[in-house]
Amino acid sequence: MEGAGGANDKKKISSERRKEKSRDAARSRRSKESEVFYELAHQLPLPHNVSSHLDKASVMRLTISYLRVRKLLDAGDLDIEDEMKAQMNCFYLKALDGFVMVLTDDGDMIYISDNVNKYMGLTQFELTGHSVFDFTHPCDHEEMREMLTHRNGLVKKGKEQNTQRSFFLRMKCTLTSRGRTMNIKSATWKVLHCTGHIHVYDTNSNQSQCGYKKPPMTCLVLICEPIPHPSNIEIPLDSKTFLSRHSLDMKFSYCDERITELMGYEPEELLGRSIYEYYHALDSDHLTKTHHDMFTKGQVTTGQYRMLAKRGGYVWIETQATVIYNTKNSQPQCIVCVNYVVSGIIQHDLIFSLQQTECVLKPVESSDMKMTQLFTKVESEDTSSLFDKLKKEPDALTLLAPAAGDTIISLDFGSNDTETDDQQLEEVPLYNDVMLPSSNEKLQNINLAMSPLPASETPKPLRSSADPALNQEVALKLEPNPESLELSFTMPQIQDQPASPSDGSTRQSSPEPNSPSEYCFDVDSDMVNEFKLELVEKLFAEDTEAKNPFSTQDTDLDLEMLAPYIPMDDDFQLRSFDQLSPLENSSTSPQSASTNTVFQPTQMQKPPIATVTTTATSDELKTVTKDGMEDIKILIAFPSPPHVPKEPPCATTSPYSDTGSRTASPNRAGKGVIEQTEKSHPRSPNVLSVALSQRTTAPEEELNPKILALQNAQRKRKIEHDGSLFQAVGIGTLLQQPDDRATTTSLSWKRVKGCKSSEQNGMEQKTIILIPSDLACRLLGQSMDESGLPQLTSYDCEVNAPIQGSRNLLQGEELLRALDQVN
């Protein structure tokens, strides 16, 4: 029993020795291992205080990472660093807005810069050697693997494989908003903008001892830039940066006012507009993908892109966009952008979108327009305030009136004596055929006859309160000077040319007037002057050869545009009347009636009548009656159209401005009215006479040279407001009675004014009485076949005039007898 107990004790002692030896061997082994790790840790390029506290796993992790980095560095062609480069190395990381990270193709972080602690809260030694997938968001792992993959397959000819990488990565961050460090288990996700490239290292030592070649080493070199939250921006924004807030559809809801200085936009005009309207077209695809990442990961930075300026061109901008979430339901609420403008406006004269054309199309108010508005204000301003406004612009001070005591220098617009008459005539303001008197003596001597008004008669102003259409500016231009009671007009001196050799005898009917004053007739209350026929014919005739320089202006100036304005309410309306007694006895009178009987005064008891008195020598009247009234003609006669509205809106207008005027203005006949109508045979002594004629065709009859002159006349333009030639020259519209198949016509008369002319010896005084338009229409309105007379418009008067001459017209006593019967 004792032997068995001693053996057991020996076994226990041997086992304890073995355990002790094992513990000593393990202790020795650990100590040797620790010595090895200690020596290895001290071999790492780490500070002593860091390397002395590293565990074995960290030493192994860091050593492996270090060996890989050394392998990468040995594969490259590295230059020997000089002292200057060594000193600059410490500034590189400070210049970066992020940290540097090198990943293997497996995702291991073989190198990370020591400033990662500043941005992520994690130290360099905590991350080096670890897999990047241990610190990144699980939703980003797939994208991360795609970025690490380098395809070694065949590449199309002419193209290189893209090795550039740019993506957004969410990584764990242990930093709080206050800058404190938290536990890794409580870390939040921070978005990093990672940009870099894949680098392939092909070393010479890839050939192993076994004979196979190792693949080249591939790594991804990245610069990771964290995107700051707008609420955590500590650095003040400079003048080249502006803030903006957008809705989830990227429409502006707020914009900083600094955008006005940078791009020209006003913050108010951007509200409600989509940011996509202001992107350059070439950057829209890139920005669309960036906004996709923003809604997925919460934050993005766009990189540099082009944004259109307001007035053309674009600027380069880099934007940091952040999605703001609602604190209650964690739903996205809006987007806040920090925009950094990195350039000025480029190609400012180039238009890229319709928004940039709005400012081009909008009129810009110039300084001249402001000055005009300043003087056209209705309310009167104080002179001192006006001076204060104008003194800011020195050129505008010339518009102020001189102060009291200043010397006023009168402006002399007279011409020098060395100027020719033709140069002076170009400066003469012509108002149709009526011209205000000129102060220049030379102009008065160039065939300009002045017809003074009597001292007892003062010309009435052209302004009329009853006529609102009368322009004040026109009235001021046409109103005669109160200091000068003289009016003058110019008329080309013409010579009648015979239409054929057989018409040569008609040129001796009357001497040619020497001055325009012979065209004027004085209207006396006694109606004792007689009417000069030939002068009236020449008044409305125009010759091709002029005797003074004024005739050269007939084709250059639109004189009718400068004629005195006549309100329409001064004339009589065309109206339709009931049927009166027929004029059957008035159509069969002979043509050889005496001219004197035509001008006999007719006793009328109707109120106001217009009288025209003229003077003519007895020799002239004898010449007129020589050929049996051949020279007495109807200048204008109108057939009535079959269908005319009863009440046309147009009204004839008088060519004279006022009843106080005493100067007749001769107007030239226009081709727009005469070219189809003035081929008739002369039958009437005056264009102011009333006649009833029958329409016949006589191509074999000879044409009077006086009517030829009227036929060939050309007028510049038609009178506005449906006015015809007869309204312009003051010719009373005439009534023509055609054959049985023609309809009768009723037209209104014009009031005619005359001016005083010098009396001649041996004159006989005759008087012609012109009946007002209403009375004449009532007297002549009845027809034999019609129940009423249709109204005539100016178009009917101009188009439906007779082409050939008229025969068998009522003359002299027959005409007056017909008028008496109607009365």
UniProtKB/Swiss-Prot annotation:
The modification S-nitrosocysteine is found at C797. The modification 4-hydroxyproline is found at P402, P564. Residues 85-158, 228-298 form the PAS domain. Residues 21-30 are annotated as: DNA-binding. S-nitrosylation of Cys-797 may be responsible for increased recruitment of p300 coactivator necessary for transcriptional activity of HIF-1 complex. Acetylation of Lys-532 by ARD1 increases interaction with VHL and stimulates subsequent proteasomal degradation. Deacetylation of Lys-706 by SIRT2 increases its interaction with and hydroxylation by EGLN1 thereby inactivating HIF1A activity by inducing its proteasomal degradation. Gene3D superfamilies: Helix-loop-helix DNA-binding domain, PAS domain. Induced by reactive oxygen species (ROS). This is Hypoxia-inducible factor 1-alpha. The gene is HIF1A.
